């Protein structure tokens, strides 16, 4: 469960390291974001000499959360960290690589480009 003011790690090579969520998109006053939700975030930590700079406003999709996700088959999955991948307006990733596993729920939310770049889908 991601809410405004939550810090997330960046799971791609776009140049940002840490994001802070400032808004969850979808719905009038959506309070919490889960895996597959698009958020508006601000870059809090970035690598030098990269296109993304600190204090830049970006869109990102949540790929891992510490809060468990219950699936229809009775299983649940939980990750060690909150992580997101920075995307553009069309929903394509800004980076060229994704680090770490991503959840299968991204494929159901039509983020197939993110799923194809990920090294592991759980």
From Swiss-Prot:
SMART domains under this entry? Ribosomal_L14 (SM01374)
Keyword entries, A-Z: Chloroplast, Plastid, Ribonucleoprotein, Ribosomal protein, RNA-binding, rRNA-binding
Gene Ontology MF, one: large ribosomal subunit rRNA binding
Q: Where in the cell is it found?
A: Plastid, Chloroplast
Q: What is its main location?
A: plastid
Subunit structure comment from the entry: Part of the 50S ribosomal subunit.
Signal peptide extent: none
Picking any one GO biological process from the record gives: translation
Q: Which gene encodes it?
A: rpl14
Question: What InterPro entries has UniProt attached to this entry?
Answer: Ribosomal_uL14, Ribosomal_uL14_bac-type, Ribosomal_uL14_CS, Ribosomal_uL14_sf
Lineage of the organism: Eukaryota, Viridiplantae, Chlorophyta, core chlorophytes, Chlorophyceae
Which cysteine pairs make disulfide bonds?
A: none
Which Pfam family, any one of them, does this sequence belong to?
Answer: Ribosomal_L14
Listed name of the protein: Large ribosomal subunit protein uL14c
State the similarity comment.
Belongs to the universal ribosomal protein uL14 family.
What superkingdom does the record give? Answer: Eukaryota
Q: What does this protein do?
A: Binds to 23S rRNA.
* Entry GO terms, CC: chloroplast; cytosolic large ribosomal subunit
